[in-house]
């Protein structure tokens, strides 16, 4: 299996199979995050994805769920995500659901119709690290987007009927920004 930036996953994905389709983080500028500091962002070549899917199939594990690796696999274009799902179905034809991390701005390049289509294909969850809903905290932490972007993109997810979860970092505002962050 190809894992160039290690495995990072939410606790509830512990039983999932992991497939690297990107490595590192496309933004990689958040002040608090060290997960991907040593891993430049890159997209896994199709050959590596095929090799990993072949290895999963050969293991005999009847995988039910895949959690895509990399901080931002949903930054990939709709057509690339479709191709990845086609490969998953080719190698694991019994049907699996797929989720992964995504930045809020990574779904900006996808229409509601494309998000609906991704859901129908089997992509059923994006985990967004929003961290805060306060613009001052988002700016201080160098997230690269604002609360209005969060609302806009998650509303698009709602309209598409695609599930998501969010990571909120309690205490991120510290003493100076704590009240705005908490509210």
Where are the predicted features?
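Canonical Radical SAM [4Fe-4S] cluster-binding loop centered on the CxxxCxxC motif
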Residues: 4-47
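Active-site mouth loops of central-metabolism enzymes
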Residues: 40-46, 101-108, 173-181
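Conserved C-terminal portion of the radical SAM core fold
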Residues: 125, 148-183
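An acidic, carboxylate-rich microenvironment
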Residues: 47-48, 80, 149, 181
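Short microdomains enriched in Cys/His and/or Lys/Arg
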Residues: 44-60
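A short, flexible beta-alpha/helix-coil linker loop
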Residues: 37-40, 73, 133-135, 170-174
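Conserved SAM/AdoMet-binding glycine-rich loop
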Residues: 57-152, 159
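Conserved hydrophobic beta-strand within the GNAT/NAT acetyltransferase core sheet
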Residues: 19-21, 100-102, 166
């Amino acid at each position: 299996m190809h894992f160039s930036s290690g495995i990072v996953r939410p606790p509830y994905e512990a039983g999932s199979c992991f497939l690297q389709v990107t490595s590192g983080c496309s933004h990689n500028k958040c002040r608090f995050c060290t997960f991907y500091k040593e891993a430049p962002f890159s997209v896994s070549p199709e050959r590596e994805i095929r090799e990993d899917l072949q290895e999963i199939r050969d293991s005999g594990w009847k995988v039910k769920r895949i959690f895509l690796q990399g901080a931002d696999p949903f930054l990939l274009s709709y057509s690339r995500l479709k191709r990845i799902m086609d490969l998953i179905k080719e190698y694991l034809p019994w049907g699996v659901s797929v989720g992964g991390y995504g930045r809020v701005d990574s779904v900006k390049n996808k229409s509601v119709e494309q998000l609906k289509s991704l859901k129908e294909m089997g992509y059923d969850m994006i985990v967004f690290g929003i961290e805060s809903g306060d613009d001052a905290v988002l700016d201080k932490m160098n997230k690269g987007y604002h609360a209005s972007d969060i609302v806009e993109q998650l509303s698009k997810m709602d309209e598409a009927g695609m599930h998501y979860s969010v990571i909120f970092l309690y205490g991120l505002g510290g003493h100076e920004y704590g009240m705005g962050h908490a509210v």
